[in-house]
């Protein structure tokens, strides 16, 4: 059995007109800071506790001069945080048996950026769960921007953009 945990930042530019029906047994709440969370049993992925941070920010909020910034920041979050300097965040998750790109990933869309990782239930004990929540916390308020990582990510994102260029 798997557990799916999602945390969403408030964003009111596109309010939901009809509430989304959640599966029975879903625990839903809102913290005093506005963070909306869901905890639910999820059969897929099997034997995993999946964490998702859904930030309601994407390319729609960018000006012409900021084009690509949301995607760039998505990449930078894996390059170091307050509690997980440099690549130690990815290294920690990989030490639990996860694979970067498969079990650890993120993407930026038109109106949201989603970070996710799936902790194997073999490792989903108190310490791993605490550290998983700390990762979500750091992604919200603890990303460090290393100039070396910035230069490296520029090249990666430019290559990704070339892959999407229709010309």
Question: PLM features: residue spans?
Answer:
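Active-site-adjacent, His/Asp/Glu-enriched structural segments that form or flank metal-binding
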Residues: 55-70, 74-167
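Proteins with a high burden of low-complexity, intrinsically disordered sequence enriched in S/T/G/P/A and R
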Residues: 18-19, 32, 93, 167
């Amino acid at each position: 059995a798997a557990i799916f945990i999602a945390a969403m930042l408030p964003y009111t530019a596109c309010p939901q007109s009809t509430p989304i029906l959640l599966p029975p047994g879903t625990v839903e709440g809102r913290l005093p800071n506005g963070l909306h969370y869901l905890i639910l049993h999820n059969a897929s992925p099997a034997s995993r506790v999946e964490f998702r941070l859904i930030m309601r920010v994407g390319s729609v909020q960018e000006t012409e001069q900021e084009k690509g910034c949301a995607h760039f920041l998505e990449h930078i979050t894996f390059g170091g945080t307050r509690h997980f300097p440099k690549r130690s965040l990815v290294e920690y998750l990989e030490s639990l048996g996860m694979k970067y790109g498969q079990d650890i990933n993120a993407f930026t869309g038109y109106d949201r950026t989603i970070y996710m990782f799936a902790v194997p239930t073999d490792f989903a004990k108190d310490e791993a769960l605490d550290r998983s929540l700390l990762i979500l916390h750091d992604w919200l308020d603890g990303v460090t921007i290393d100039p070396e990582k910035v230069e490296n990510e520029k090249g990666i994102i430019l290559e990704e953009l070339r892959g999407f260029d229709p010309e």
